Amino acid sequence: MTITPPKIPWQVTGNHWLTVPCIHPADASIHLIGALHAQSRAAIEFAGGPEFLDGREAALARLVVVVNDAPIELGAGGINWERESGWLPTFSAKAGDLLIRGTIVAPHGRNADVAGIVISVSVENRGESSVELIIGLTGTLGHRQMRVRTARAFADGHSAFKGSDHSVVLEGKSAESPLALAIGGEGEFSSEVVDGQSPGWTLDRKLSLGAGETHEAAFHIAAGPERDGAAAVLGVMRRRGSRALISSTKSALREMEPGTGNASVDRLIARHLFFAYFCSIARALDDAHVYVARSRVPWNGQGITIRDWHALMWVLPAVQLADQSLARELLLRVCELHGYAPGNGVHYVDGSLFEPGFSLEGAASYAIAVDAYIVQTSDDKVVEEPVLADSLYGSHDDMEVRKHATLPLYSTEVNPDGSVPARPFTAHGNAVVALALDVLRHTLDEKTAEKVQDSAAVRAALMRQFTIQSDASRAMLASQSDLAGATALEDEPSASMYWLPFYELLNRDDSLYRRTVKRIESAETPELVVRCAQLVGPNGAQAFEWLRRAPLDNGFAAETVDQDGRAVGNGGDAAMSGLIAYLLWYSSHALGLKV
């Protein structure tokens, strides 16, 4: 399923509890808030209206500024945006003599990891006389939906009512509604609710703002699986205070930022890394466990589903760069939920099967991911975890079933992205398997390790069976084979021949490798994953520069792009942003690519 990216360049933020993907760049209004609900195996999302992606509906929450009884349209005279650490959107706008600054933060870090959003605003009066100011937050609940890949609207109607301490609670009218939002300010605010099919609400306060004075206001939006839980989280956010929550978040993000020594590259890595970290990984509101999805952003057609390959080879490596504790939890969680049938297809977030289809790379990814995790973190004790050991044994068994009767080569049903190869034996798949076998031989118990196929034999057989042209000076590798004489040269985007050095089949300077990829260098492809693969190819520096300049989907990954790098389909690809973040870091540190 492919979705065209929205025309509005939405600002995006969030934490593991909530995603805030639709912050309007024109006025900083919030049009959608989403959370993961494990029991539903889906995202639950609140919006101002069903056409929220087009920006034509009322906002779920927007700032209210009234000066001397005259409403101010925030952003009417222009609005400037910056993103701290590549993730925290901050804005500033002028309205007459007033300078309005704001930050929208989903708290993260020590004593800040809550299911909520902080909207912090300051209003500075740069005029020569005092003004009567109303500052507040208002919004409309006009749409609620559950989404795996396609959205389904809730039919029970929307409810808004005044809570305790001048707060407002938004929820569904049914007692089974799986999400509630509690909204309140710090300090004294009045609250109003307007009933209706799409109920409206307002929090505001009045004050006099003298010349040269600055007034600060903070609003909290808290979430829970029902109204009482949301109200409790709101109470905690008020108690901890917006300044502490924002400060803790900024500190946590600074500690997580990887460094390459190049400031522009570091900013690019941080942007992709934090997008993957917060929009591919979620903690469900109803059980607080961690889950991984392709993307929590509503304009990505892969939605709240995931393949083992993407979880372990795209998302996990990026997380390891920033948060080794979460990386360990994520690795074990994937093994727990998905390891019962490694590489068996697309999964819902809870591990149940969404779409069957065996991927050789998906099965092999468990061993490679474990080894990469240990190398990155030095946590070799992780192999003692029973759930991880079970997954490794299971992945080995599933790969062995696919082994050719007489040759040490392995077949696959689908490529890593689910596409079907023209021939069942692929060069990419067997290169990945060979690397996995290297890991399994020193990870499994001694008796089982003796039965593990020698990876050198796999690589040797691959080179013999996939090399075409008898003349060594013109030899190259086929991408696929049936091992009976029929081969295919077409490069599969998700199983590109560019990756072969990455999986230690050939050196990136090897003449055979260079001839193999030369035939595909001139091919135009809309698949962004191929641009990623080119980073490890002979012209990695050019690919690095292209990725640095590509606009993508407002700076984040998209599954398909045009030749200039603008998103065409399935933007907001959080898992692929994880791949980009890791590859940019890897290219700088391991390959020495510079821009």
What are these regions (language model features)?
Residues 1-261:
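Terminal accessory carbohydrate-recognition/targeting modules of carbohydrate-active enzymes
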Residues 394-405, 411-412, 422-431, 449-527:
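Extended ligand-binding clefts on enzyme/binding-domain cores
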Residues 236-297:
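An acidic-aromatic substrate-binding cleft motif
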Residues 258-266, 318-331, 374-393, 442-456, ...:
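Structural helix-adjacent loops and short alpha-helical linkers that scaffold large soluble proteins
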